[in-house]
């Protein structure tokens, strides 16, 4: 990364690590992902949004679910932060950011799963998986390790 890029801010966002009452994790598969590639819900923060506003806007946009359907378990101290590759930085968000910085929030879904509607055209699938199966689904470089830190921090006593 050149010196000009290193002075730019990170684009902030949120990752929603959602578990259900059976301690299964909600994963989504975006269009364009390989069959083995999955992720948690989330997205970038809009100008002036708080972390919580960002979180619940993304959940509403992506799964049509409202705030009363969730209990926040915690916000991890482990952020996911990365720089865009130098050949990509100008193509993403007009070169305004050097990379992304995501807060990881763990939530329990307490609503009715039958009412979840995956509204975005970004997804080709979703599933609920147990903690023991996360590593085989979170296959992007360092993805499992990054999320595992938040899960261990906030859920270790819950998912034993």
Protein language model regions, located:
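Conserved N-terminal beta-strand and adjoining loop/helix that marks the start
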Residues: 2-25, 41-47
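Anionic group-transfer/hydrolysis microenvironments
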Residues: 22, 31, 132
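A conserved beta-turn-beta hairpin within the catalytic core of GNAT-like acetyltransferases
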Residues: 33-36
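Unchanged
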Residues: 45-142
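Charged phosphate-binding loop/patch that engages nucleotide di/tri-phosphates or the phosphate backbone
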Residues: 136-160
